[in-house]
């Protein structure tokens, strides 16, 4: 409570106190012993209009700055108990970052002045549309600071309330995990799937009005708040979900039009003149040549979902032949997961099977992990492998920003030596025609295409053991398995120490093991054990002899690598939280199996854009159709023309024709110069 006169002064309202009643043409408020006279300006009247509902005549002018009068006013508009909450708002509403933003826009920075300014905006009928993002900010990493301030503000509010209640033991405390908890509970938080580098970048470029202090209620998003506004041009792309989340989650453009590190947005008059692929399109739209100008907008939204979110790396894939350069920019725009970028100028000092070591000119060293890693696909319920490789050798120099290692299934330089380019799909010869082999959204593919578009899929099987359980048999990472094969066999602990001793002695006796009532962990697929991970809440010293040996063998292998690259060894005993919740004195073992998944009947492929096909038949090898022009070249798939027309994806036939022209032009030039090539397009 700052008092009425102070509030009027901060609102820059000229006022005076008079004992006699002012003329009717003046604005005034009557008190018990006088009148408060103020300028009858529209903004002043709107701000002070609420006082006419309050019985000011019961109070003298001397009482207008007192807390009792303020509490009585609160009682009229709600309840007196809200006073403590309003005090907290007064102290905490304007955080340092908000104050900086207000100064940038030349807005008031003090709580009372901000409320007065907000009231003055009601004077005119001018308004901004719900979807007009002018004046909004693009916030990224600063959200962590918001969570910190939120946690501190909540703690301070509780402390202030205890102080006002005269609690002598009042303390300002904060939960150790408060910031992490707020981040995890935020409506914009989600797991990062590692299917492709394209998905990684689009996940980073996803924006929403949801989140901390945002519009988090689904009923807030009516049609008028889901449409695309002209103020979004060169800031937000047209791509969005095409289901219930349409217009709620959006994608930023590649080169978003922002000002300053705080991400200020302005509605520029020349925005249309500045429109181009980088400024106007999302990365997925830029990787879909002709798509935004020739496809139905609804299909463009579907392209974003099918290409960015559902696309997966395959056995063989190629870059675009028709490109605007976005596919070459992509490896430099993502993190080091799929393409490792040098932080400074430097040189390669060591290359081993598991890692590469580099030394920068500043004297700093860096290590590139060349091992195969299992990463999560949070949307699909399976995992994938990511492995970086390098084309460099020991002693080779590089510049800051150069890509020194990359995932070869994601990138290649096939269409330009040294120009690393994103592999978006398999370049294949198809026929667009009316045929029973491809009716509506069904299609037929060749056996070679089915193999080229195969993927290595990883599935997980886990087992939770007590620390005294006895391991009878186990397989190791790298071992081949068949579906249903036992990978890990153990028996529950017994209380009798003599019985435990007997069990430990029988470990090497397979016949005896089979007769025991053991528990087995079997493989779900036929493939290879890719990795084994262990999470334990107990030290190995407390485990059974066989379980301790199993865990230590895996620990030692990991520690050998960490010592070689001079990285700290992680704590082996973990708290019983997260995935280990309610797992005291237990060991969680995760087995990851990789299997080779080729295309089969019922699988879906995307020809391009949002044009998908469900496989109804696979041509056997040697039975594929061929064209009369290139008799050595087999057709990889048949695409029904009705599917192209019905889905209004005009970019597909145009891009197909352009690809054909480029391929045949390349061959014609090679024919002129006598350069041999494979006319089967299989190399």
Model-derived segments and spans:
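A short, sequence-level motif marking secondary-structure junctions
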Residues: 42-44, 251-254, 369-376
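Conserved structured catalytic cores and adjacent interaction surfaces
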Residues: 262, 268-683
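N-terminal non-catalytic structural scaffold regions of very large proteins
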Residues: 1-206, 242, 253-256, 260, ...
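Solvent-exposed alpha-helices and their adjacent loops that cap or buttress functional pockets
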Residues: 114-116, 228-230, 314, 423-425
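Short alpha-helical segments and helix-capping/turn motifs at coil-helix boundaries
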Residues: 132-135, 233, 415-417, 514
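Conserved mixed alpha/beta core segments that line enzyme active sites in large multi-domain catalysts
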Residues: 1, 184-255, 320-344, 349, ...
């Amino acid at each position: 409570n700052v008092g009425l006169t102070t509030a009027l002064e901060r609102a820059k309202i000229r006022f005076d106190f008079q004992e006699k009643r002012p003329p009717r043409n003046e604005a005034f408020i009557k008190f018990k012993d006088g009148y408060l006279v103020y300028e009858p300006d529209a903004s002043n009247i709107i701000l002070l209009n609420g006082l006419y509902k309050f019985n000011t005549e019961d109070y003298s002018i001397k009482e207008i700055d007192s807390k009792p009068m303020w509490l009585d006013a609160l009682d009229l508009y709600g309840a007196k108990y809200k006073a403590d909450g309003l005090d907290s708002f007064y102290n905490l509403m304007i955080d340092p970052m908000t104050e900086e933003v207000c100064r940038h826009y030349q807005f008031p920075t003090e709580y009372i002045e901000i409320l007065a300014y907000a009231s003055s905006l009601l004077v005119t009928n001018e308004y901004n549309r719900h979807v007009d993002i002018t004046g909004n900010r693009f916030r990224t990493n600063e959200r962590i600071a918001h969570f910190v301030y939120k946690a501190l503000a909540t703690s301070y509010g509780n402390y202030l309330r205890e102080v006002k209640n005269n609690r002598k033991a009042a303390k300002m405390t904060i939960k150790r995990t408060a910031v992490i908890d707020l981040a995890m509970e935020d409506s914009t938080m989600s797991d990062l799937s590692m299917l492709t580098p394209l998905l990684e970048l689009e996940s980073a470029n996803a924006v929403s009005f949801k989140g901390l202090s945002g519009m988090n209620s689904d009923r807030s998003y009516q049609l008028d708040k889901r449409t695309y506004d002209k103020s979004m041009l060169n800031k937000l792309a047209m791509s969005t979900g095409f289901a219930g989340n349409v217009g709620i989650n959006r994608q930023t453009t590649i080169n978003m039009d922002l000002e300053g590190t705080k991400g200020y947005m302005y509605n520029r008059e020349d925005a249309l003149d500045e429109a181009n692929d980088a400024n106007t399109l999302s990365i997925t739209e830029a990787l879909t040549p002709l798509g935004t100008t020739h496809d139905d907008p609804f299909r463009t939204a579907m392209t974003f979902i099918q290409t960015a979110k559902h696309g997966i790396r395959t056995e063989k894939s190629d870059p675009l032949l028709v490109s605007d350069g976005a596919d070459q920019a992509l490896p430099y725009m993502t993190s080091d997961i799929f393409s490792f970028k040098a932080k400074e100028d430097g040189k390669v000092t060591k290359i081993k099977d598991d890692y590469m070591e580099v030394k920068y000119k500043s004297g700093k060293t860096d290590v590139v992990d060349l091992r195969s890693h299992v990463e999560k696909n949070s949307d699909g319920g399976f995992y994938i492998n990511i492995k970086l490789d390098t084309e460099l050798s020991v002693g080779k120099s590089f510049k800051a920003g150069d890509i020194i290692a990359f995932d070869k299934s994601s990138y290649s330089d096939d269409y330009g030596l040294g120009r690393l380019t994103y592999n978006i799909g398999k370049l294949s010869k198809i026929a667009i025609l009316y045929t029973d082999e491809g009716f509506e959204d069904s299609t037929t593919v060749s056996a070679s295409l089915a193999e080229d578009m195969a993927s290595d899929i990883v599935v997980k099987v886990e087992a939770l053991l007590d620390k005294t359980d006895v391991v009878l048999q186990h397989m190791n990472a790298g071992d081949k398995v068949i579906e249903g094969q036992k990978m890990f066999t153990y028996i529950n602990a017994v209380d009798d120490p003599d019985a435990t001793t007997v069990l430990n002695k029988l470990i090497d006796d397979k016949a005896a093991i089979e007769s025991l009532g053991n528990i087995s962990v079997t493989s779900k697929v036929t493939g290879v054990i890719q990795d084994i991970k262990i999470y334990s809440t107990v030290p190995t010293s407390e485990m059974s002899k066989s379980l301790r040996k199993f865990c230590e063998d895996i620990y030692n292998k990991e520690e050998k690598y960490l010592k070689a690259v001079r990285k700290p060894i992680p704590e082996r005993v973990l708290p019983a939280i997260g995935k280990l919740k309610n797992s005291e004195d237990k060991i969680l073992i995760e087995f990851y199996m990789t299997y080779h998944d080729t295309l089969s009947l019922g699988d879906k492929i995307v020809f391009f854009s949002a044009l998908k096909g469900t496989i109804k038949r696979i041509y056997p090898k040697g039975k594929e159709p061929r064209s009369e022009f290139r008799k050595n070249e087999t057709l990889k798939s048949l695409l029904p023309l009705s599917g192209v027309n019905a889905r209004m994806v005009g970019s597909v036939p145009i891009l197909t024709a352009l690809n054909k022209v480029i391929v045949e032009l390349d061959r014609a030039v090679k024919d002129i110069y006598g350069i041999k090539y494979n006319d089967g397009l299989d190399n």
